[in-house]
């Protein structure tokens, strides 16, 4: 079974029913049913989104716990320095995390699943667009 590292936006879209890309993400996931990996960065993205949206902290943690309880879930610690994330092509601060996630996925011989076409344009074969 293929494992993909879900970026934060994919994780949010899969778990938040009223997210603009929820149906797209769920349809993509159900078609291929890959194993999805999360890491502290992507899990933090989900928690920040939920809490900023007004979800109580305990409820946000329960959502994350539900994701982590699935058979298709894999957790990857981000025990890797940013120095190994090749920042080639990075032109702005928002791309630094993308570079790190790609490096983490590559370390696990996998790719990043994303809704971000810019990430796919920059990292090509190291990423997969969710559509």
Task: Label the predicted regions.
Residues 70-117:
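Active-site neighborhoods of divalent-metal-dependent phosphate/nucleic-acid chemistry enzymes
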Residues 32, 123-124:
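Short, structured coil segments at secondary-structure junctions
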Residues 10, 42, 81, 118-119:
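Alpha-helix capping/helix-boundary segments
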Residues 1-38, 50-62:
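Short, well-structured N-terminal submotif of metal-dependent ribonuclease cores
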Residues 7, 38, 94-95, 116, ...:
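Histidine- and aromatic-rich ligand-binding microenvironments
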Residues 124-131:
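Active-site regions of enzymes building and remodeling cell-envelope glycoconjugates
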